[in-house]
Regions:
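Residues located in well-ordered beta-strands
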Residues: 17, 67, 95-98, 136, ...
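Beta-rich carbohydrate-recognition and catalytic domains
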Residues: 1-14, 20-63, 70-123, 142-185, ...
Length: 341
């Protein structure tokens, strides 16, 4: 037995969380529920049994389903706070504190100890889903992390409890729940310069009435309607078209429709197909490590894209495969105006 509890104790021996300390090789277990203390004990990393003579340490209250993380010199204690098991009325949310020592004290962003009920919010009810709880961390690779948890109730799924996977971000050495990506129409903008991805077609000027800016208007001002696909598409070249980066002007050749491809997925999302909105011009990776717009969707791996938010909050867009190589490559800006892989 590693830990146990009786009915009249101030700690329930459930909801275990483990951390093998990468700095010392020591193995630690946190456990407990909302109705008492969260406790920490040390285990033998070889046997999994409790270290002889080790006494539990109280490290938090008002939470349960705890998990321990070590990162950048900090130990993190994540716990689930609030009420559970009441569907759409559940107030579960995930909170965190951190410490320079595994045994605490774990303190939140405003200096409150978790042993006194503190905790910085990581994720709460959102997007018609209530009661996020039971945090887990998965490091996919350097710079790409995911957090697993469940919602007590998803209003769009009959109020059922559902599994969730979100990007895990780090801001000022605090864990933050990343964004839930949705299909839609987007500008694809580079981090390098802020230019937008577009197909390489001629820029079509918009006509306007010219009045000197220093003269008071003589008639009511009219809104300028955005340029439409119908106005410009007929002049675009047929077949494959090159892709480039340029100033974003919300023109039709810069608006990308991102939709699930219906061809499998990866941890946290489906593969997507990406095309110019309203057309069949699909973003495609090439053997030359660049990208083009093909005039049709073939379903090839070079047209299937995984979209992930990285730990710094930026996004990575990466083809399932690039022709001629097994190397994992992502969409990047080579210089200000040239996209590549």
């Amino acid at each position: 037995v590693v830990a146990s509890s009786l009915d009249d104790e101030d700690c329930d021996a459930i909801d275990a969380g483990l951390l093998l300390d990468p700095t010392t090789g020591r193995l630690w277990l946190s456990y407990g529920t909302y109705f008492g203390f969260i406790r920490l004990v040390e285990l033998d990393p070889k046997t999994g049994k409790r270290m002889e003579g080790n006494e539990p340490v109280n490290i938090a209250i008002d939470c349960e389903a705890t998990d321990l993380i070590y990162r950048n010199g900090w130990y993190y204690l994540l716990g689930t706070h609030g009420t559970c098991c009441d569907g759409p009325n559940s107030t579960y949310n995930i909170v965190v504190g951190r410490s320079r020592k595994i045994t605490g004290p774990y303190v939140d962003n405003v200096g409150r100890e978790m042993l006194q009920g503190g905790g910085k919010m990581v994720i709460a009810a959102n997007n018609l889903k209530t009661g996020p709880g039971h945090f887990g961390r998965y490091i996919e690779e350097e710079g790409v992390e995911k957090m697993s948890f469940h919602y007590e109730s998803d209003f769009r799924q009959g109020g059922r409890s559902v599994l969730a996977i979100r990007p895990l971000l780090w801001k000022n050495d605090w864990p933050v729940a990343g964004d839930e990506f949705h299909a839609g129409t987007y500008e694809i903008e580079s981090e390098r310069r802020g230019y937008a991805l577009e197909i390489a077609v001629d820029f079509v000027r918009m006509q306007r009435d010219i009045e000197p800016f220093w003269i008071k208007p003589t008639k009511p001002l009219k809104n300028i309607e955005p340029q439409t696909l119908k106005e410009v598409e007929a002049e675009w070249p047929k077949g494959e078209v090159k892709v480039r980066m340029n100033d974003y002007m919300f023109r039709p050749h810069q608006k990308w429709s991102i939709m699930p491809a219906g061809k499998g997925g990866y941890l946290g999302g489906p593969y997507y197909k990406i095309c110019i909105e309203g057309t069949t011009r699909y973003l495609t990776a090439t053997a030359q490590h660049d990208v083009i717009a093909k005039p049709e969707f073939t379903g090839e791996d070079a047209q299937l894209w995984r979209i992930e938010q990285l730990t710094d909050g930026t996004y990575r867009i990466m083809p399932k495969a690039v022709p001629g190589t097994e190397e994992k490559l992502a969409l990047v800006s080579l210089g200000d105006c040239t996209p590549g892989l």
